[in-house]
Amino acid sequence: MQMNRRLFGLGLGSLGLAACSRSVTARMSTAEPEGLPADLLPASNRAYDAWVVSFRERAMGQGITSATLNTAFQGAGFLPGVVTRDQNQTEFRRTLEDYLAIAASDERVEKGRAAYARHRRTLFAIEENTGVDAKIVTAIWGLESYYGERQGLIPVISATSTLAFEGRRGRYFERELIAALRIVQNGDIQASRMTGSWAGAMGHTQCMPTVFQEYAVDFTGDGRRDIWSEDPSDALATTAAYLERHGWVRGMSWGRELVSGSPSGTVIQPQAGGPQFDTTRNFRVIKRYNPSEAYALGVGHLADRIGGAGPLRGSFPPDANGLTKNDRIALQERLTARGFDTQGADGVIGSNTESAISAYQASRGLPVTGTPSQALLQSLR
């Protein structure tokens, strides 16, 4: 999640804390716990240990039992990498064109359609109960954790206690830590299974602990609200419950790309020269999940694609380097054909493409910039 970004978490976007999760560009590690980098393993820190002692008193004063604290903090500890990630967040902004290309990539759409079909009965039951479009719920799932594949493996007790101790947003994260302990105390999850992102976002749809407390649903009826389970039912129902409580209107779409006809809602054009979108009240409800306009458009567009719609019909202007999407795809294809693998040709310039450009430039004795350009494209013809 993003603190002000998202209430639930992107799956795609920038790091922040919103409702249940994350943001606009990348995703979490899928490594096994033993594969976590060293800086995300507990490290000795006497000041942290002393803080935990004082925190225990405050937690017990709020109804957390000594037994819960003992169990939850067994094996927990200070994670230096969490502090580093919190302090080194950068404002990395993609264009809307790039963001939507990632959010509704062919692979994400294909996986989304498969997930939608596989969990159709559950999704339709959730839609019947809440009124929230099953495709919207599926799209949020896809952006937040790639349909459950990238939920994060960092212990939530360690992550939130580290951030509460570190102090930059100590009061906020102490509330999240207390909420996480209540979840354990309630029996929804064992502390050892409560894992998520470095910021404490959890489960299939990347819920922060306080949001879990207020909105989590035991859809399966097993007595636990398990948003981490291989069965995503509780997590999907929780996401729908959040949207319902924030004003989702049954039977109303999120909006549409405005290609023809008169608008019926609020028209937005997030990227100058790009497509316009006619948005509804439900679009604004999605923004309660994550206030990023790009995120909400990503959810809506991915949901449409999961439902069988095609790509956007409108075009975007050339980028800052003078390249259109087709130019960027051609550049990636030509670099790969020359032996400089860009790891795919989607028109999005990322680190793989920049590395391939740099390697090509070095092989030709050119200044190594890693920057795409029309001249570079022409040289590859």
Predicted regions and their residues:
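Short, solvent-exposed loop/turn and secondary-structure capping segments
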Residues: 84, 150-154, 194-195
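Short acidic, glycine/serine/threonine-rich helix-capping segments at coil-helix boundaries
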Residues: 323-328, 336-380
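N-terminal export signals
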Residues: 1-27
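Signal peptide-directed extracytoplasmic domains
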Residues: 74-121, 125-126
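Extracytoplasmic and endomembrane cell-envelope/extracellular-matrix remodeling and assembly machinery
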Residues: 35-57, 62, 67-71, 75-76, ...
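Export/targeting segments at the very N-terminus of extracytoplasmic proteins
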Residues: 49-64, 105-143, 153-154, 162-171
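Acidic helix-start/capping segments at beta-turn-to-alpha-helix junctions
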Residues: 69-92, 141-145, 155-157, 260, ...
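Bacterial Sec signal peptide processing site at the extreme N-terminus
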Residues: 20-40
